[in-house]
From Swiss-Prot:
The chain crosses the membrane at residues 3-23, 44-64, 71-91. It is a multi-pass membrane protein. The keyword Ribonucleoprotein does not apply. This is UPF0316 protein Mhun_0543. It is found in: Cell membrane. Keywords: Cell membrane, Membrane, Transmembrane, Transmembrane helix. Belongs to the UPF0316 family.
Length: 200
């Protein structure tokens, strides 16, 4: 590379800040996913992400220290951190890692709805409880987070104004889950077969 370009204002105030910004996006995005993996029990994958995260961070902070009198580098460093945090959360949401527990509370009759859930292969636990306005049914399900959109559709079909909550689950030792055809990612919507066993 031309030595003159390396000492030019374009390189110092343009290219270097851009590289710092991109490096921060990468390492913070990886760090966000790593933290979520740790919280959800992916203990063997998280260290791999940690290695790349800290390596990229060292490259970024090294350039900041090498250009410590360049204020644009500080702006790029902070902006990259903010953008990386947002992008990391978006990536994790699209990856749909881990398990979740869905808790549905309804005063409506649930026999047909529960039968439909079980037909699709979901493990359902239901109990009768007392709500503010009378008797209600509480339905519990532990599912892969990738299945939440499908369950949300089923719940809206059952009751468009249903009250339900979704919480992360670190791990699930045993349970009933839909079997998926690996050649058809949409097979869950067609096959009511079950898998009984461990899910991590």
């Amino acid at each position: 590379m031309d030595v003159g370009f390396l000492s030019s204002d374009l390189f110092t105030f343009g290219l270097i800040p851009v590289l710092i910004f991109l490096a921060r996006i990468c390492d913070v995005s990886i760090g966000t996913i790593r933290y979520i993996m740790i919280s959800r029990g992916f203990k063997f994958i998280a260290p791999v992400f940690g290695f790349f995260e800290v390596t990229i961070w060292l490259l970024a902070i090294g350039q900041v220290m090498a250009n410590i009198t360049n204020p644009i580098c500080y702006i790029a460093y902070g902006a990259g951190f903010a953008a990386g945090t947002y992008i990391g959360m978006e990536l994790e949401e699209r990856m749909k890692l881990g398990m979740a527990i869905i808790r549905l509370i309804t005063p409506l009759p649930t026999e047909d709805f529960i039968a439909r859930l079980r037909q699709y292969g979901y493990g359902v636990t239901n109990i009768t409880a007392q709500g503010a306005n009378g008797e209600v049914t509480i339905i519990f399900m532990v599912v892969k987070r990738a299945k939440i959109p499908h369950l949300a559709i089923l719940i809206r079909d059952f009751n468009p104004h249903a009250f339900y909550t979704i919480e992360d689950v670190r791990s699930a030792s045993e349970g009933i889950y839909p079997i998926e055809d690996k050649n058809n990612p949409f097979s869950i919507f067609k096959r009511p077969f079950l898998f009984i066993g461990k899910r991590k």
